[in-house]
Amino acid sequence: MSNEAPEVEPHSKRRKKEASPSSSSGFLQSLPEAVAMICLARVSRLDHAALSLVSKSCRSMVLSPELYQTRSLIGYAEKFLYVCFCMPTDETLCCHEKINGNRSLNVLFLDCRSHKWHHVTSMRVARVSPEVSVVDGKINVWGGCKYKHYYDWGEVFDPKTQTWADMSIPKPVREEKIYVVDSWDVGSYYYLPSKSIWEKGNQDSKRSKDWCLIDKLIYSCGNDGGIYWCEAGELDWCDAVGIDWREVFGLEFLSKELRESRVVYFGGKMVKVWESYKIMYNISLNLEELLPETQLTNLTELGHNVLVFWEKLECCCDGFKILEIWCAEISLERWEGGEILGRCDWCHPILAINLLTVDPLFYHSMVLYSIPVDV
């Protein structure tokens, strides 16, 4: 008979056994379904993938629409930013271009809960790179088409009925305006849903590279890399008055990054070629002004903050080039004197692309769309 004391397992191993998936699953299964759903709803969405591996019942609850409804009802929905990048391959140089030479009627819908793409009802008019906005829960799409009639220029999608209609709204909803900035005509237009009419706004929109609206102020990125703002109502002013663009202070470091992002692809060779064309054909535009669609810079509204995207071309020690996509979150504070101060709350690269087999001059990345979603 042995007098040795029984071997005791280390504390860490006991903790692992106590927190095993089977015991966690059994605990949830012992609760009423509604209570278990509330417990899961309080868990961050970043942990849902791990939770779905615990058991079949946990996976079923994590994937159920009721979980996201519960998260919203009890105030635990989290805000995530979804960004659609143009990442051209050798076969597709730019996804803003036409598909096989044609505009497309197809529309894809991303379910932010399951991260799956679905086809929805096709548009009435084939388009490429249209502008999109949401008003009163309906998706307004306009531009990017060859149209014979004015009503072909824009159309509205109703997610509830899954149908498209022209942009003329028969009954007034509320006095909201949809602003459109034409980068070629260097001017603004706005659409009144309540009256189903278009009006010409101020044509002095020269600082327009990207736009977003926050707290009734319009923010835009200038060609010099600065971020500027104006009152929303100024887009309605007559041309003689002009738009009073004011710079957001405190973002000097960001201005340098955005300014360099404009010419990151051009290099000395391309600039020299273009300079010879300018002399030959008496052209006054610079190369970066001629190719605005190659720029990644994008402004996105995130609550009361603004997100800025830009690109950096880094050279590695082995001679290879890496394209980094950067993002910064800027908080905005309006002072008593009316000026606006910007502070960088967060700034990091979010994507790196190895340009081993791609000429950086012809690799044009851009942010197509970006939107914050509560999930």
From Swiss-Prot:
Pfam families: F-box, Kelch_FKB95. It comes from the Eukaryota. Residues 25-71 form the F-box domain. Keywords: Kelch repeat. Kelch repeats lie at residues 138-183. Signal peptide: none annotated. Residues 1-27 are annotated as: Disordered. This is Putative F-box/kelch-repeat protein At3g24610. It comes from Arabidopsis thaliana (Mouse-ear cress).
